[in-house]
């Protein structure tokens, strides 16, 4: 898919559904890779796969989001006190 778990990402939780009109996937993972590098990976993946991509900061998170037709993605990223990067990746109709 367009938005895999980041290489060297350690999945903490994953969930999804294909019921109804919207396929939804949610994955939370941690990585030792710096936050900016992980965010750049998803920004590049979005653009390379024809998605729009916007980066904002809100409530302590870095957020990259975008759409392509009826498909959408959101990446919430933060640096943990331990130094690890934590990412919540949400996709719909990927």
Where does each model-flagged region fall?
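An acidic-aromatic pocket/loop used at catalytic or ligand-binding sites
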Residues: 1-94
């Amino acid at each position: 898919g367009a938005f895999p778990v980041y290489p060297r990402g350690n999945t903490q939780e994953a969930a999804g559904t294909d019921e109804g009109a919207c396929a939804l996937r949610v994955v939370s993972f941690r990585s030792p890779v710096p936050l900016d590098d992980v965010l750049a990976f998803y920004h590049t993946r979005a653009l390379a796969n024809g998605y729009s991509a916007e980066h904002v900061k809100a409530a302590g998170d870095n957020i990259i989001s975008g759409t392509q037709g009826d498909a959408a993605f959101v990446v919430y990223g933060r640096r943990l006190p331990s130094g690890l990067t934590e990412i919540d990746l949400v996709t719909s109709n990927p």
